[in-house]
Amino acid sequence: MPRYALRIEYDGGPFAGWQRQAAQASVQGAIETALGRLEPGPHTIAAAGRTDTGVHATGQVAHCDLVREWDPFRLAGALNAHLKPLPVAIVAAARVPEEFHARFSAVERRYLFRLLARRAPEVHDRGRVWRVPHPLDPEAMRAGAAHLVGRHDFTTFRAAGCQAASPVKTLDALTLETVEGMNGTEYRFHLRARSFLHNQVRSIVGTLERVGAGAWTPDQVREALEAHDRAACGPVCPPQGLYLTGVGYPADPFA
């Protein structure tokens, strides 16, 4: 059966996450339903990242197996026609070898978290950023973030119910971009790793926000990391500011 990779964009707000749910809307379920309108099913797709409720994506990657050979451009267009009016889009499709696996072939995942500092409620970005009503110190947050880059035991920064076999991960990059706007300052956290633990990004950003607000010192981030204790983590920030922005493979399937 021919295998296709799909690059997917979605607004996570209306969905109970990526993974198919029995009684709730999911991104996986929406795409599998659309595939069923192109070819008889059942269809099961696999994704590089199983994003949680409310988390968005601009560069999710999944793969599917189909019966017939499809022109990738036409496949993307046909799926988009059947996904309407849901906030899900197939940005690109590509024919890939049968050994390609969207999850297990991935060598890198990239996330963005958008944190907006302003007193007024957000309007145009509602549901797409995490807003805090107080100013933040970006240099303090960068100093705290520096303690987290590299290979560490991230027990403190993973969900209590995380099912990963090991809490040890290598965080390849964690950078902070400051975007000054007329109506507030946005802080964009860019994170890159081969893989992440459940709630790792939101735990890290929630903790760094406390540093930026002056409630924590940068050195307390190191102390929390070295505690290897979930109770030492700062607050877990809400999901709406988080985006899966890209997935890397040894060879780009969409090139």
Swiss-Prot record:
UniProt KW keywords: Isomerase, tRNA processing
PANTHER family reported for this sequence: PSEUDOURIDYLATE SYNTHASE (PTHR11142), TRNA PSEUDOURIDINE SYNTHASE-LIKE 1 (PTHR11142:SF0)
Function per UniProt: Formation of pseudouridine at positions 38, 39 and 40 in the anticodon stem and loop of transfer RNAs.
Active site: D52
Catalytic activity from the UniProt record: uridine(38/39/40) in tRNA = pseudouridine(38/39/40) in tRNA
Pfam (any one): PseudoU_synth_1
UniProt KW Iron-sulfur keyword: no
GO biological process: tRNA pseudouridine synthesis
InterPro entries listed in its UniProt record: PsdUridine_synth_cat_dom_sf (IPR020103), PsdUridine_synth_TruA (IPR001406), PsdUridine_synth_TruA_a/b_dom (IPR020097), PsdUridine_synth_TruA_C (IPR020095), TruA/RsuA/RluB/E/F_N (IPR020094)
GO molecular function: RNA binding; tRNA pseudouridine(38-40) synthase activity
Subunit structure of this chain's protein: Homodimer.
Positions of substrate binding: Y111
NCBIfam families tied to this protein: hisT_truA
Enzyme Commission no: 5.4.99.12
Protein name: tRNA pseudouridine synthase A
Family that this chain belongs to: Belongs to the tRNA pseudouridine synthase TruA family.
HAMAP family: TruA
